[in-house]
C-alpha cells in the first residue's frame, strides 16, 4: 500500500512555519551553526543556536515545535529545525540528503537518524562518540536506561555500539503489528484477533473479509514492499530471518524464509490483498471500510484520514500473527553529534532533553512517528488512553523483538531485499528462486566496500 510509514517513509511535504521556531524547507541551507570542526570543549551558552534535521510532517509540527520551544525556554539554546523529508520519502533517501548536506559543508549539528543509518554515518567518520558526554551525566543516562525494555536495550548495545563507542542514545522505537478495522470485523461476526493468533487465523479472516465483496483483507506495501514492514514480520514469525543473529551474514534462502514468502505469495494469488506494484492507499481504504487490516507500528495513527476519536473507535491493534513463534522487527532512532558541529555541549543538552520524562511523555509519537522508548510512559494509561485499543502491544512485543540495524552497503541491501520480495509477490520468481536470488545478491553487496 502507499503509506506515510513514519520511521520508514515520510510525507513529501515538509515542516510548516510555526510561531516561536525557525523552520527551513528541505532545499534551503540550514542556518545557525558553523561548519567548522568544534572540539566540544566550550560550555553551552544562551547564545547557542542548533541546526537539527527532524523527520516530522506538517500535522505534527505544531506540537513538536512547542516542545522545542520548551527546550529553548529551559536552556536558552535555540533550535533551527529543517525537514529531512525528501521526494522519495524513504530512510535511504533521507540518509542521502543528510550526507549531501554534510559533504557540501552545510551547517548541521545533528539529525534524527534511524537504526539503519547508524553504522553508515559512523563508518563515514562524520560522528563524534557520546562517551565523554555520557560520562559527565552518567546518573541521568542510567536512570533513562533503567526505564527502557531490557531486551531491546541489550540488543541495541550489542549491535549499535560501534567499535566500543556509543554514538546514539535511542529515544523512540517502532515494531510491526496488525491494525484491524473493528467495525469490519464486527459486521462479519469475526472475533477481534488476540495475541498468539496464527497465520491460519489471519488468512481465514482475510478470506471472510473479501468474500462476496470488493473489500480486501490485508494491504501489502506499494509501490515496492519494505524490508521492515513487509518482509521481516513474516520471516521472523516463522523462526527465520534475512540475516543471522549478529547481522553479519545473509540467511535469506532458509526453509523458514521460503515458507514465509510462499504464504504471502498465496495471499496475492488468492486475491486477499492488493496487487503488488502500482499504488494503494491502505490507510484511506481501511478508514473507509474497504480494507480489513494493514501492518504498522504507531506511525499509522497520524496517517489515517480520521480524527483521533474516530481512529480510536474504528481500529484495534494486535501483534503479528505467528506460524511457529512470536516475532517482530524493532527499529529505534536518535540524535548523533556530527563532527562538524561547533555547538557540541549545547547539542548534548538537546539530546538529554529528548530522553527526559517531559519530552518522552509528549511529542515522540508525532515527532518521529515513534513510540516513546521510556516504558513508564509507553505503558501508562495517561498515554494509552489517547490511542486505539491494543496500543499496549507495542511494549509487550519488545520482549521478543529483533533489532534491525544497518549493515555494510545497507542502502543497496535494503533495495535488494525489497526487489527480490516484490518479484516473488508478482510471480516473476518462485519463492525458492526469489529467496536464493536475495541470498546471493545481499551476500555480494555486504562484501562490497562503499
Regions found by a protein language model. Give the residues of each.
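Short helix-initiation/N-cap motifs at beta->coil->alpha
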Residues: 84-97, 197-203, 275-287
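Conserved N-terminal structural module of periplasmic/extracytoplasmic solute-binding proteins
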Residues: 2-126, 138-145, 192, 309, ...
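Short, solvent-exposed loop/beta-turn-alpha elements that line the ligand-binding surface or hinge
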Residues: 131-148, 195, 217-220, 240-259, ...
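Hinge/lid segment of periplasmic solute-binding proteins
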Residues: 116-175, 316
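Glycine-centered hinge/linker elements that transmit conformational signals in sensory
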Residues: 205-210, 246-276
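Extracytoplasmic/periplasmic substrate-recognition and gating elements
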Residues: 51, 69, 74, 78, ...
